[in-house]
Amino acid sequence: MAIGSLSSLGLGSKVLNYDVIDKLKDADEKALIAPLDKKMEQNVEKQKALVEIKTLLSALKGPVKTLSDYSTYISRKSNVTGDALSASVGVGVPIQDIKVDVQNLAQGDINELGAKFSSRDDIFSQVDTTLKFYTQNKDYAVNIKAGMTLGDVAQSITDATNGEVMGIVMKTGGNDPYQLMVNTKNTGEDNRVYFGSHLQSTLTNKNALSLGVDGSGKSEVSLNLKGADGNMHEVPIMLELPESASIKQKNTAIQKAMEQALENDPNFKNLIANGDISIDTLHGGESLIINDRRGGNIEVKGSKAKELGFLQTTTQESDLLKSSRTIKEGKLEGVVSLNGQKLDLSALTKESNTSEENTDAIIQAINAKEGLSAFKNAEGKLVINSKTGMLTIKGEDALGKASLKDLGLNAGMVQSYEASQNTLFMSKNLQKASDSAFTYNGVSITRPTNEVNDVISGVNITLEQTTEPNKPAIISVSRDNQAIIDSLTEFVKAYNELIPKLDEDTRYDADTKIAGIFNGVGDIRAIRSSLNNVFSYSVHTDNGVESLMKYGLSLDDKGVMSLDEAKLSSALNSNPKATQDFFYGSDSKDMGGREIHQEGIFSKFNQVIANLIDGGNAKLKIYEDSLDRDAKSLTKDKENAQELLKTRYNIMAERFAAYDSQISKANQKFNSVQMMIDQAAAKKN
């Protein structure tokens, strides 16, 4: 105790010093603090041991919970013959054999677009143009600027479609090995990419269809398309369909009738053959699409065109160029040219002109030029079209070059899709997007993907290749007992790890008087007996006595549990319903017709464990909380005892110091008197 050093008290006495105080304090600490420390150590040991027991019980609860779950007993597994598909099955699927004939796999659209290049950094186009295509019920127009590289164009396609259609630069080999590919991310016929122009129908007419000529001799339905000679040609369509035909059947018949009519016309025969013009059904046959990948106009003519579902009977032409801004007001200077035809801006505009007046004057001048037309759109901006689909814009002098900006135009060449198709957008379809087609136990089915999970609930199929005729893939669905076997194996392991720990912590040796840390805790001492009581549970049925021993579980004389897996498998295979009833439970009706559920043995195990560790009112949780409270109380008691001793011995030290001072003064006085006595004695001598 580092308070200081006291001299002895009393004449010649060395009793009152700090060594004495420390000895007194040590004695008090042994009497007050040491018992508290011992209790705190025991509390920590109990909390640690309790955590271990709860952990072991949680490990036991895992397999018990599985074995008390109904889904465990209706678990299924599948086996597939052949390589055409893979399959997985969920719980409760009826045990059966499923025959699957795979005619077609779903696939995405793969297209080559444009010429080949020596590098992905080569310039794709020297002109401004627009790539037009349609897929997934949406039209896309990808703006391509002069000077963009092959890689830039590929990325622009991907970005414009949010990755639904991917522009890919592929190295295919040769002197110019790089090729732009336009592919769809997803499979299915609705993911087909249609370049150029298209018309689409949505047929709802359930009546009979008769397509021929009307009273005036005109075709009731005809197709008006650009032929191989570049001119528009009209082709009549003839067809008779009964009322009984479905929408899909009608669209398929219309498709074939249109294709046949075009194939029979020399203007279109080769265009149908090479895919420049195509007619397809979409959306499971609910819709029909006519496509001209050259970008030409498509028109469905005749009095019955709308009866075929063509609400829009002609394609809408896209404008070639829209200015980036409204034309500047006031007088504009300089000369500009459109396709070589000059416009003198100073002659067309005045200082007092508004933007609208300048726009009207310039539009009038453009419309007077050969092959050009212009108008003002709803935004007040200049729109220019060219009969050839090509427009070259140029500033003819310095003022004209500067004034292009005031017109919202840029110098250069602009081409329509149709004008660019033969040079930039020549496309070749390498793989046509299509649905998968297969039969499921004889029923014909189509799906947009090869992942099929909606034919029968719980059966998931992945189509991988087509099957040979009359050699279907067979999915055999059978009972899966492995989860039961695995859970029982885990149950035995967890039980055999828990029991030795319980024995150790609750033991009592009468000879040595040594007791386990939980020897006096009834809730923990009762765990083993509670589990063993459930283990010994049996029930009489029509099939005899049901007990865990029947399923290969047993306890030896040392309390070690074992599992005879062969015996378990035999019992599971011979009567799975009896296993389910004994392990999980069974349902029946009482005399009044009410449903009652008889709990199985593992439901009983689950309840025993839940009462111990689940929730705030679980027995071990309550005991754990009591240990926490005891720990806090002991800590507080120790702090109070330490504070008491500190105060007591601080006061004692202060008093000893005062006594020491008084005795020191008395000693000094005594020494003075002694000196006087000694001096007097010396004089006498």
Curated annotation (Swiss-Prot):
**Which InterPro entries would you find in this protein's record?**
Flagellin_hook_IN_motif, FliD, FliD_C, FliD_N
Name where it mostly resides: secreted
Q: List the disulfide bonds.
A: none
Keyword list (alphabetical) reads:
Bacterial flagellum, Coiled coil, Secreted
Q: List the GO biological process terms.
A: bacterial-type flagellum-dependent cell motility; bacterial-type flagellum-dependent swarming motility; cell adhesion
Cellular component, GO, one term: bacterial-type flagellum filament cap
| Effect on the protein of changing A59S | In strain: KCTC 0217BP
Which residues are in coiled coils?
618-647
**Outcome of mutating S86N:** In strain: KCTC 0217BP
Impact reported for N270D? In strain: KCTC 0217BP
Q: Which family does it belong to?
A: Belongs to the FliD family.
Q: Which PANTHER family match?
A: FLAGELLAR CAP/ASSEMBLY PROTEIN FLID (PTHR30288), FLAGELLAR HOOK-ASSOCIATED PROTEIN 2 (PTHR30288:SF0)
- What quaternary arrangement does the UniProt entry report? Homopentamer.
Q: What is this protein called?
A: Flagellar hook-associated protein 2
Top-level taxonomy: Bacteria, Pseudomonadati, Campylobacterota, Epsilonproteobacteria, Campylobacterales
